[in-house]
């Protein structure tokens, strides 16, 4: 009869590595009895008193009579018996919970029950089927089992579970699996059961849904839009880009009605397919907005009355400035607005809002007045900040407006004249049909071709009758002009045109009177036509010195003395004829002098008829002499122009007034210096003026016209050439003409080299060199002082200074 036992063996020996496998198919009944599969059910824990007892003793062990050499098997069996009793107690508790009777009915009475009933250690009974070999192997397995139980006593192993989780049904099933029927006759069946059962590991629990959400693998149906209209929409793309006037009108109205152009407002979408249906066209939307605004204003406290007005009238700097320009742009939209509005109430509201905008621009008064006075021109700082004049911008705007108006006026007749030509027909479509702007109209005539306009330089022209010089540099024919002057003097009907600037003309006449050997009657007649005494104080030093030299005096350094001498000479010369003709003192002649015949009539009234006849004869003689001298002067002028042109072509040196750093490389060669000497000698020897001067004239000595009937050369040429050159220009020439130092070490550089090297110039030394050697290079007899040299240096930006031991302070 097969018996099944459940044995738990505790060992107190040290831990050893188990070399046997649990699932061994060749094990016998004894091995199967010892190596039962480990139960997965929780085992009952031993009590605290059992744990603290010695591991080799138990409460059921009775010490022997001192024979310690007894077999160890009996001791091991006694220990296993105690453990089996504990296991039986736990089994009884499990049987109380349920299912103990069922299990006993199904299972036959086995050896485990007898062990549980008897507290004594059981003695194994060997059947006849067992052999000696089997007993030997059983002893070995028992020893291994006892070692395992002893090593297990050191470590408390178990599984703690909550009482509510485990169920009785599961416990019964597990206990059934743990208890295996061991019979020597059915070993192959036991082998199959061990292979099927395996290690009896508990099945892993299913993962909780709270930790990781499960992936929804189900297919979801996606509702797709109907794309049938896309084919038609693609063809209508270009139509949507068109300009819709109604939509633009509604947008401009919303901007003007809501307030300033820069106010942050809600975006309003406009239906492009139906442009007529917009929020501005619906009166209900406007009424709703007005109601919302009224409710907001009613909720505000009464103390904020002033702030309400300010919030209603949005006044910003940008709004005020741009409102001046947006007024004109929105005037042409009023008619379109009236067509779109649905009711009179909405139109009245919009009108009130536009009035509020206008009043908003005008308030507060001072700020708006200040803004209106300003002229706004948009540009960069460098473009706007050109001049400091406050009226510059306003004048510029006036000129721009005037030019625009003139363009508009010019377009009207041009359109009428071009209508007949048929070039610009409004029926054809062309990009050249638009109106032209200022850039296209400039320098073109009415027919559209380039206009060849002659440009006249009116800066130096002081008389209307004077002809401008020809572009190729040729001078007007003076012989023809002189002939016309003589004819005009002979005729009593033609008036004589006289310029306002008469100082140089007086000088020329005085020179002519002083040089020409005429009779005292002729000089008296010529002096009668002389104008009042010129203002010598306005003349330059060169003109004064020239005039003094004409009277026979030596050049003077003092300006006041020269002026006094000239005034006395002029009074002494014109004292005899001054009583004949009366002039307005201090006022220049305005060109309203009488004719030659009127002057003769005045002289006839003061003198006898005989004197008048003699004067007429003298006049005719003077005219003949003037005609002869004019022809001679023209011949000399032609020769002088030829010589000057030849000199200019031969010499490539350009005479410069200013001293620059780059002039150290442009030093004249000896041949150029020789040509300059020859030119200066020819200028000084020639009593007649040269028409073209290679040296620039000073700003004060401008060209003047010869309006009288004199046969002398023009006053402008005589003033620039016959007069002595300026001392400043002479100093510049002398500095440049000084020979260059050719020494190796350059211990004594020239004055020009010192100036170029920014060396300080000692004024006393420089003035001494000019008076002794420098001015002699340019044939100048005058002398200069250190103070005059200082002024010349400062005007040219040259570093200069006096000596330290001098009384003057060092510069």
From Swiss-Prot:
One of its GO terms (biological process) is DNA repair. GO terms for molecular function: 5'-flap endonuclease activity. Residues 36-49, 689-704 have a biased composition (Low complexity). Residues 107-116, 599-609, 712-723 have a biased composition (Polar residues). One of its GO terms (cellular component) is Slx1-Slx4 complex. Pfam families: Slx4. Residues 90-103 have a biased composition (Basic residues). Belongs to the SLX4 family. This is Structure-specific endonuclease subunit slx4. The gene is slx4.
């Amino acid at each position: 009869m097969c018996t099944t036992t459940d044995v738990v063996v505790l060992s107190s020996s040290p831990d050893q590595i188990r070399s046997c496998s649990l699932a061994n198919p060749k094990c016998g009944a004894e091995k199967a009895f010892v190596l039962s599969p480990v139960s997965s059910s929780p085992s009952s824990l031993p009590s605290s008193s059992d744990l603290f007892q010695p591991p080799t003793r138990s409460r059921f062990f009775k010490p022997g009579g001192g024979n310690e050499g007894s077999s160890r098997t009996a001791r091991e069996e006694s220990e296993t018996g105690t453990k089996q009793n504990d296991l039986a107690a736990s089994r009884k508790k499990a049987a109380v919970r349920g299912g103990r009777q069922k299990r006993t009915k199904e299972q036959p009475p086995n050896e485990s029950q007898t062990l549980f009933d008897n507290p004594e250690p059981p003695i194994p009974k060997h059947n006849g089927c067992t052999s000696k070999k089997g007993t030997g192997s059983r002893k070995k397995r028992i020893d291994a089992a006892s070692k395992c139980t002893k090593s297990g006593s050191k470590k408390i192993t178990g599984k703690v579970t909550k009482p509510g989780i485990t169920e009785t049904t599961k416990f019964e099933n597990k206990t059934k699996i743990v208890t295996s029927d061991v019979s020597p006759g059915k070993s192959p069946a036991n082998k199959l059961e061990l292979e099927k059962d395996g290690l009896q590991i508990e099945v892993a629990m299913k993962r909780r849904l709270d930790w990781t959400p499960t992936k929804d693998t189900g297919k979801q149906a996606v509702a797709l839009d109907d794309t049938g209209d896309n084919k038609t929409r693609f063809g209508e793309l270009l139509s949507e880009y068109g300009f819709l006037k109604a939509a633009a009108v509604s947008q401009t109205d919303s901007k003007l009605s809501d307030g300033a152009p820069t106010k942050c407002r809600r975006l309003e979408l406009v239906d492009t397919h139906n442009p007529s249906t917009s929020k501005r066209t619906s009166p209900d939307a406007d009424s709703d907005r007005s109601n919302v605004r009224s409710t907001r204003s009613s909720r505000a406290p009464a103390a904020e009355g002033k702030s309400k007005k300010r919030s209603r009238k949005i006044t910003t700097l940008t709004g005020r400035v741009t409102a001046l320009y947006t007024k004109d742009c929105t005037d042409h939209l009023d008619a379109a607005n009236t067509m779109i509005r649905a009711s009179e109430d909405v139109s009245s509201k919009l009108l009130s809002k536009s009035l509020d905008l206008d009043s908003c621009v005008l308030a507060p008064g001072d700020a708006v007045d200040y803004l209106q006075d300003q002229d706004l021109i948009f540009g960069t700082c460098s473009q706007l900040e050109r001049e400091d004049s406050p009226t510059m911008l306003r004048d510029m705007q006036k000129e721009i407006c005037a030019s625009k108006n003139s363009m508009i006026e010019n377009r009207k007749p041009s359109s009428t004249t071009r209508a007949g030509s048929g070039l610009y027909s409004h029926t054809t479509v062309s990009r050249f049909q638009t109106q032209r702007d200022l850039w296209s109209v400039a320098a073109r005539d009415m027919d559209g071709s380039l206009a060849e306009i002659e440009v006249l330089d009116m800066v130096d022209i002081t008389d209307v009758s004077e002809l401008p010089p020809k572009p190729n540099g040729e001078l007007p024919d003076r012989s023809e002009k002189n002939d016309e002057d003589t004819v005009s003097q002979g005729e009593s009907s033609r008036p004589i045109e006289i310029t306002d600037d008469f100082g140089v003309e007086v000088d020329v006449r005085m020179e002519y009177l002083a040089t020409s050997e005429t009779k005292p009657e002729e000089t008296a007649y010529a002096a009668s036509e002389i104008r009042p005494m010129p203002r010598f104080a306005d003349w330059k030093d060169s003109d004064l010195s020239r005039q003094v030299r004409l009277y026979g005096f030596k050049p003077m350094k003092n300006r006041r003395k020269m002026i006094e001498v000239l005034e006395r000479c002029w009074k002494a010369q014109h004292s005899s004829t001054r009583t004949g003709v009366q002039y307005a003192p201090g006022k220049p002649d305005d060109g309203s002098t009488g004719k030659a015949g009127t002057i003769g009539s005045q002289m006839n009234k003061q003198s006898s008829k005989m004197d008048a006849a003699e004067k007429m004869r003298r006049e005719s003689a003077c005219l003949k002499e003037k005609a002869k001298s004019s022809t001679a002067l023209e011949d000399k002028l032609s020769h002088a122009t030829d010589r000057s042109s030849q000199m200019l072509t031969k010499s490539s040196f350009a005479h410069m007034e200013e001293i620059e750093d780059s002039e150290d490389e442009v030093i004249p060669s000896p041949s150029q210096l020789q040509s300059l000497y020859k030119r200066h000698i020819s200028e000084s020897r020639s009593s007649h003026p040269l028409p073209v001067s290679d040296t620039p004239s000073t700003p004060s000595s401008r060209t003047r016209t010869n309006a009288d009937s004199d046969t002398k050369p023009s006053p402008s040429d005589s003033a620039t050439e016959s007069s002595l050159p300026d001392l400043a220009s002479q100093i510049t020439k002398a500095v440049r003409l000084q020979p260059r130092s050719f020494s190796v070490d350059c211990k004594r550089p020239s004055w020009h080299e010192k100036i170029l090297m920014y060396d300080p110039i000692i004024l006393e030394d420089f003035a001494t060199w000019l008076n002794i050697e420098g001015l002699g290079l340019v044939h100048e007899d005058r002398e200069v002082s250190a103070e005059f040299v200082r002024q010349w240096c400062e005007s040219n930006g040259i570093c200069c200074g006096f000596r330290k031991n001098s009384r003057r302070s060092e510069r």
